[in-house]
Swiss-Prot record:
CDD domains named in the record: SAP_SLX4
Protein name per the record: Structure-specific endonuclease subunit slx4
Membership in a protein family: Belongs to the SLX4 family.
Post-translational note: Phosphorylated in response to DNA damage.
Organism expressing this protein natively: Neosartorya fischeri (strain ATCC 1020 / DSM 3700 / CBS 544.65 / FGSC A1164 / JCM 1740 / NRRL 181 / WB 181)
Biased composition (Polar residues): 644-653
Subunit structure, as described in the record: Forms a heterodimer with slx1.
Disordered as annotated region, ranges: 36-194, 212-231, 249-312, 465-494, 575-719
Length: 812
C-alpha cells in the first residue's frame, strides 16, 4: 500500500511547481489589505527526504474527513484484481490532476481568507478529490504561505474553528483596519463581486462540516447586520426619551395640582390649553403615547372648565385674604384670556400679557403708602378660617361696619370731649386737650365697656369758686356769645392764647418753681402795692413787650399777638388769684359730685396760685428771704415743702410726691400737718410717742410693714425715747421736710429732701453741719447731732450716705 501511494505522489510531484509560481500575482498588496509583498524569488524544490515522509502526511490529514479515508481503505482492500487496481490508479490520477488545477485557482483566495477570518485550512470543492494529496505539495504550499504573510498568519496549524466564532472574534484582531474592511465588504457590491470572482464558496465547506459541527442557521448573519443598523436608530430613539417633552410635563403637573388657596399653585389647564408640542420621535410607540396623552388631556378639559366656579367657596387663610386684593385681578384677567385664546396660540403671548398685568399692580413708594392707608385689613390668628360668598364680601363688610359706627355717633349725644376739641380749643395750641382723640380719651371706658364721655374743664376760664362744671347732660356755653376781649371786664375770662408747646412747658415749670402760698401775709403785703388797672398791652412797643415777657420768665416770641395774649393772661391770673384768695383744703369727698367739685377747686387754686406768684415772687424776693428766718415763715413755708417734691433737674414736671404720702396719713403726716400739730400742741408733742421714721417718701411702705419693723426690730434710739424730750431722730425728719425749696430755675443747689428723693449720696459731715446750724432750728431744737448719729439715722431710713474720703477710710 505504501508502494502504491509512493507512485502516486511521485507522478504528481512535478505538477506542484507551477502552482507556487501562479500564487505570486494573487497575493499582491492590494488584495492582501496592506500586507507585505510576496518575495519575487522562486522557492527551492523540495528534497526527496521531505517528499517521502508517510507519518507526516498521515498526521497532517488526521483532522480531515475520516469517513472518506476509511471508505477509501475499504475500497482498496476489496479490490482483488489487477484490472481493478489499474482502473483505480487511472481514476486517482485524473482526480489528482483535476484537484491540482482547482487548488491552483483557490489557493490565493483561501490564504487571504485565512488572514482575515482565521478559518481552518483550505478544503477542496469536490468530495472525491480530497483523498489523494501529496505531502510534498502540502509542504510547498505551507512554505509559500509563510513567506507571503511574514509570520503574521498564526492560524495555519491545523486548528478548526466554527463559522459563528469567526464573526465574534473580529474585534479581537490586532489589525483594526482589516476588521473594518471585512465588515465593509458585506455592504459594498464591488467587494461581493470580487469574492465571487475569486471563488470563495463557503456554502460547500459548511455542508462538508455538518458531520462534526452542530446545525446552525447561517441565514441569521444577514439579519444580524440589518438588526445592527436598526439598533442604531432605536438607540437614538431611546436617547430622545430623555429630552424635555412639554406634553409629558404638563400631564404630570396636572395630576399633582389641586384646588387650594390663592397662594398655592394652580392648574396648568386653566392657563395652557394648547395642543402638546410635536416630538421628534418617529417610532409607532412614541406616536401611540402622544395620542394617548392628547386624548387624556382632551377628556380632562371639559371637567376642568367648570372647576374655576368653585373659587368663591374655597377656604382662605389670613395671608390669602390680604393678598386677595392683588391676586384676584390677575387671575380674573387670566380666566378671561383663557376663553379667547385658541389652542394653537403660543405660550409666550400669554406670559407677556400676564407680565403686563403684574407690572400694572406695582405702585411708586408714595402711592403705595397712600394705598396701604386706605386698605382694609382684618387681623386674627393664622388658624382662623372664613368662608366668603363673593370676592367683595370683605369690602362690603368694612363699609357696613363704618356705616354702623357713623350712625351710632350721630344718634348718641355729643360728648364734652368732642365739643371741647371742636369749639373750645379749636384755635389754641396751649391746651393739653389739643385733639379729642388722645390716649386717655380713647381708652377711657365705663363699667359697661362702652366709651366714657370725658369732661374737659377749662381751668383758666373758671374765675370763681361758685362756678361749677356743667352737668353731664348739659352743654357748655357757646364761646361766640362772649364779648370781645377789648370790652370784656376784669371779672370775665379771656380766650386761650395760641402758644407753642415749648412755651406751654415753660409756663408750667416756671410757675411751679415760683409758686408760693396764697395765705402768706408778707407776700400779700408786697403784692398789694403792685395792684393797678390792667394796662393796654396792644399800645405798647415791641421792645416793651419783650422786656415784660422776660420779666415773667418767658423766652422772646416773634409774634406780637402771642406776646400780648401771654401778658394779658398772666396779669389776669395774678389779680384774680389775689381777689378770690382761695385756700387749698386737702381731703377726699364723700360722693361723686362732691369729688368732682373738690377736684375742680384744687385745680383752680393751684392754677391761681402759680400765676399769682409769677410776678410777685420775682419782685419781692428780698422780703421773702428775710421772712424765711422769722417765725412767720414757719406758718407759710409748708406749702414750699409740699411743692418741693415736684422739683426735678429737668424742665418737665412729674407727679406730686405728697399725693403718695397722703395715703399714709396715720404713719407719716405731711409737713404742713406736722407743723400745725407742732404749733398747736407743742406741749403735747414733747411728751407724745415719737413717730416712726422707717418709711420715707422715696421708698413708701405700708403701715403694716412699718409697724412690724418697729415692733420686731429694736430702735437704736430707745434711750432717747424714754426722756420727755422728742426723739432726736424724729426732729431730724421734721427738719428735713421743713427745709425751704431753692428758688433757682436750674436747681443747682437742691434741698436735702430733694437729694434724698433723687437717691443722691448724703455726705454725713455736711448734713450734720446743716442740721446743727439751720435744720434743727426750724423745729426749735437746741440739741446738736454728730456725724455718727446722722449715719445711724440714715441707715435706719435706708438713705444712701457716707463720710468724706479724706476723713474716713471706709465709705458707706
Amino acid at each position: 500500500m505504501y508502494t502504491a501511494t509512493d507512485v502516486v505522489v511521485l507522478s504528481s510531484s512535478p505538477d506542484q511547481i507551477p502552482s507556487l509560481t501562479l500564487a505570486k500575482p494573487k497575493c499582491d498588496a492590494e488584495k492582501a489589505f496592506v500586507l507585505s509583498p510576496v518575495s519575487s524569488s522562486p522557492s527551492a524544490l523540495p528534497s526527496a527526504s521531505e517528499l517521502f515522509q508517510p507519518p507526516t502526511r498521515s498526521r497532517f490529514f488526521k483532522t480531515g474527513d475520516g469517513n472518506e479515508g476509511s471508505s477509501r481503505t475499504a475500497r482498496e482492500e476489496s479490490e482483488t484484481g489487477t484490472k481493478q487496481n489499474d482502473l483505480a490508479a487511472s481514476r486517482r490520477k485524473r482526480a489528482a490532476r483535476g484537484g491540482r488545477q482547482k487548488r491552483t485557482k483557490e489557493q490565493p483566495t483561501n490564504e487571504s481568507q485565512t488572514l482575515f477570518d482565521h478559518p481552518e485550512p483550505p478544503i477542496p470543492k469536490h468530495v472525491g478529490c480530497t483523498s489523494k494529496k501529496g505531502t510534498g505539495s502540502k509542504k510547498k504550499r505551507t512554505d509559500a504561505a509563510n513567506k507571503c504573510t511574514k509570520s503574521e498568519n498564526k492560524t495555519i496549524t491545523g486548528k478548526v474553528t466554527k463559522p459563528g466564532i469567526t464573526e465574534t472574534t473580529k474585534s479581537e484582531d490586532k489589525t483594526k483596519e482589516l476588521v473594518t474592511a471585512d465588515v465593509s465588504t458585506g455592504k459594498s457590491p464591488a467587494n461581493k463581486l470580487e469574492l465571487e470572482k475569486d471563488g470563495l464558496q463557503l456554502e460547500v465547506a459548511m455542508k462538508r462540516r455538518l458531520d462534526w459541527t452542530p446545525t446552525k442557521d447561517t441565514g441569521k448573519q444577514a439579519v444580524a447586520l440589518d438588526d445592527t443598523g436598526d439598533n442604531k436608530t432605536r438607540f437614538g430613539e431611546l436617547l430622545s426619551e430623555y429630552g424635555f417633552l412639554k406634553a409629558a410635563t404638563d400631564s404630570q403637573g396636572d395630576s399633582k395640582l389641586s384646588d387650594g388657596a390663592p397662594t398655592k399653585r394652580r392648574r396648568l389647564e386653566l392657563v395652557d390649553t394648547r395642543t402638546p408640542s410635536t416630538s421628534k420621535r418617529t417610532s409607532p410607540d412614541a406616536d401611540s403615547d402622544r395620542s394617548n396623552v392628547r386624548s387624556t388631556r382632551s377628556s380632562k378639559a371639559p371637567a376642568a372648565e367648570g372647576k374655576p366656579k368653585k373659587r368663591s367657596r374655597k377656604i382662605t387663610t389670613l395671608t390669602g385674604r390680604v393678598t386677595a386684593l392683588y391676586t384676584n385681578d390677575c387671575t380674573d384677567h387670566l380666566d378671561a384670556a383663557n376663553t379667547m385664546i385658541s389652542p394653537s396660540d403660543d405660550v409666550s403671548s400669554k406670559l407677556f400679557s400676564k407680565s403686563l398685568d403684574i407690572d400694572s399692580c406695582v405702585l411708586p413708594p408714595e402711592d403705595a403708602v397712600d394705598y396701604l392707608k386706605d386698605q382694609d385689613l382684618i387681623f386674627g390668628t393664622c388658624s382662623q378660617l372664613e368662608r366668603e360668598d363673593s370676592p367683595t364680601m370683605l369690602r362690603d363688610m368694612q363699609k357696613a361696619i363704618r356705616a354702623s359706627e357713623n350712625s351710632m355717633i350721630e344718634n348718641r349725644k355729643p360728648s364734652s370731649t368732642t365739643r371741647a376739641g371742636s369749639g373750645l380749643y379749636s384755635h389754641t395750641a396751649v391746651s393739653r386737650f389739643q385733639t379729642p382723640r388722645d390716649l386717655w380719651s380713647v381708652a377711657a371706658r365705663d363699667m359697661d365697656g362702652s366709651l366714657a364721655e370725658i369732661e374737659v374743664l377749662d381751668m383758666v376760664d373758671i374765675t370763681d369758686i361758685s362756678e361749677l362744671p356743667p352737668k353731664p347732660n348739659g352743654e357748655l356755653p357757646d364761646r361766640s356769645e362772649k364779648n370781645d376781649k377789648d370790652t370784656v371786664s376784669q371779672g370775665e375770662s379771656f380766650r386761650p392764647v395760641e402758644i407753642t408747646d415749648e412755651v406751654e412747658v415753660e409756663v408750667d415749670v416756671r410757675t411751679e418753681n415760683l409758686a408760693t402760698s396764697e395765705t402768706n401775709p408778707g407776700e400779700t403785703a408786697c403784692g398789694a402795692s403792685e395792684l393797678r388797672p390792667r394796662p393796654r398791652f396792644a399800645d405798647w412797643k415791641d421792645s416793651d413787650l419783650l422786656k415784660q415777657v422776660r420779666l415773667y420768665g418767658f423766652k422772646p416770641m416773634k409774634s406780637r399777638r402771642k406776646m400780648i395774649e401771654v401778658l394779658e393772661r398772666c396779669w389776669k391770673a395774678q389779680h384774680v388769684s389775689t381777689r378770690t384768695g382761695v385756700q387749698d383744703v386737702p381731703g377726699k369727698p364723700d360722693d361723686g359730685s362732691a369729688g368732682k367739685a373738690g377736684t375742680i377747686k384744687s385745680q383752680t387754686n393751684k392754677q391761681a396760685s402759680k400765676m399769682d406768684a409769677a410776678e410777685k415772687t420775682r419782685k419781692a424776693s428780698a422780703c421773702l428771704k428775710e421772712e424765711a428766718k422769722s417765725s412767720t415763715a414757719l406758718e407759710d413755708k409748708p406749702s414750699h415743702a409740699a411743692d418741693g417734691s415736684s422739683q426735678v433737674l429737668t424742665k418737665s414736671s412729674f407727679a406730686d410726691v405728697e399725693e403718695i404720702e397722703d395715703s399714709e396719713d396715720e404713719v407719716i403726716p405731711s409737713p404742713s400737718r406736722l407743723q400745725s400739730r407742732y404749733k398747736r400742741h407743742i406741749s403735747e408733742s414733747r411728751s407724745s410717742q415719737p413717730l416712726s421714721v422707717s418709711a420715707t417718701p422715696s421708698t413708701p411702705s405700708s403701715p403694716t410693714r412699718t409697724n412690724a419693723d418697729s415692733g420686731t426690730k429694736p430702735s437704736p434710739f430707745g434711750l432717747a425715747a424714754e426722756s420727755r424730750l422728742p426723739d432726736l431722730a424724729s426732729q431730724i425728719t421734721k427738719a428735713v421736710r421743713l427745709q425751704p425749696r431753692s428758688f433757682s430755675v436750674d436747681c443747682k443747689r437742691p434741698s436735702w429732701h430733694e437729694k434724698i428723693l433723687m437717691y443722691d449720696p448724703i455726705i454725713l459731715e455736711d448734713f450734720a453741719t446743716w442740721l446743727n446750724i439751720e435744720g434743727l432750728g426750724l423745729v426749735h431744737e437746741d440739741r446738736e447731732v454728730s456725724a455718727e448719729f446722722v449715719r445711724q439715722w440714715c441707715e435706719s431710713n435706708g438713705i444712701c450716705c457716707g463720710f468724706r474720703k479724706n476723713s474716713r477710710q471706709s465709705e458707706r
